[in-house]
Amino acid sequence: MAMIEFLLAGIPLLLLVLAIVQLSLLWAGKSAVDTAAHLASRKFARVARADFRRAREIAFLEAFQVCRNRPGGSFGSAAMTSLDVTKDGERGANRADAGEALCVRLTHGVELVVPWIDRFLFALSPGKKIRLGDHYYLMMQSTRWVTVE
């Protein structure tokens, strides 16, 4: 009887611990996306007035490297990184003047890696998400407004 009680109590406790681990990894992933967006937007703001296209490339490369080198990052998840630059959050921009404010939006896929919990969180997530085979990704976004130097 004690063994059955242990199993009945142990399974939910195991699932709770796994959920806490996965949520901690998601929190770390979101923090890495926020950091990548901040660093990318700073690099973009410095170069955008002289060469807008090159500034976007430099900012994307910075975001790509930060997302790839984050804990749990990989080339696979970094490949799901996009960087959008807009004037008002909606319309695309293709040039920038000094003092102009632009919106830099970074989107990055963070993989759900904890077994059993990955499917559950993937189903519950209301945001953008992608499933590739047996891998589940939540698309984390971070937005920064920058003033072109």
Residue ranges and their predicted role:
Residues M1-Q65:
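Alpha-helical assembly-interface signal, strongest on the long, hydrophobic N-terminal helix that forms
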Residues A45-E149:
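Short, conserved structural patches
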